[in-house]
Amino acid sequence: MRIGIGFDVHPLKKGETLILGGVHIQGEYGLAGHSDADVLTHALMDAILGAMGEADIGYHFPDTDPSYRGISSLKLLKKVYNMMKPRGFSIGNIDLIIMAQSPKLSPYYNKIKENYTRILQLDSSRINIKATTTENLGFVGREEGIAAQAAVLLIDTKEGDINAG
């Protein structure tokens, strides 16, 4: 078994689209970034890559590469999944936290889970999503940005041993 942790932050910007877990969330502000700025999916990809010992998304999908400009982070997640499977890993579980002062995100959890279960080929019971505010503290509290954190447990299916890898 291997554990990976991912973290990402993007600034909020008026007129941008807010995308979390591949879901478009209506609002006046969205996240700015080189790709679609899906902070939740970025944290998830970093957690999976970290558990595999494969650096981070900046290494694999650099923002200096114009081919990633505006790309859906779900497409990048599929690429990460395609790196993971041939190496004999499967996902044990995923735990995600979104840090945002607003909007209320719980109505979107099921759609986010649907996106992730489709791409990662796992049951939705293996994915947990939660959101929290920072009680108006820091850049999240001032609504300057949104942060996300992910923890992932990978199981080495080739070894079948809890100490594998």
Curated annotation (Swiss-Prot):
InterPro entries according to UniProt: MECDP_synthase, MECDP_synthase_CS, MECDP_synthase_sf
Cofactor remark from the record: Binds 1 divalent metal cation per subunit.
Site (Transition state stabilizer): H34, T133
Keyword Metal-binding listed: yes
PROSITE patterns on file: ISPF
GO biological process terms, semicolon-separated: isopentenyl diphosphate biosynthetic process, methylerythritol 4-phosphate pathway; terpenoid biosynthetic process
EC numbers: 4.6.1.12
Binding site for 4-CDP-2-C-methyl-D-erythritol 2-phosphate: 8-10, 34-35, 56-58, 61-65, 132-135, 139, 142
One family name in Pfam for this protein: YgbB
GO molecular function: 2-C-methyl-D-erythritol 2,4-cyclodiphosphate synthase activity; metal ion binding
Alphabetized UniProt keyword annotations: Isoprene biosynthesis, Lyase, Metal-binding
Top class in the EC scheme: lyase
Disulfide bonds: none
NCBIfam families: ispF (TIGR00151)
Subunit structure: Homotrimer.
Family: Belongs to the IspF family.
Role this protein plays: Involved in the biosynthesis of isopentenyl diphosphate (IPP) and dimethylallyl diphosphate (DMAPP), two major building blocks of isoprenoid compounds. Catalyzes the conversion of 4-diphosphocytidyl-2-C-methyl-D-erythritol 2-phosphate (CDP-ME2P) to 2-C-methyl-D-erythritol 2,4-cyclodiphosphate (ME-CPP) with a corresponding release of cytidine 5-monophosphate (CMP).
Designated name of the protein: 2-C-methyl-D-erythritol 2,4-cyclodiphosphate synthase
Species classification: Bacteria, Bacillati, Bacillota, Clostridia, Halanaerobiales
Gene that encodes the chain: ispF
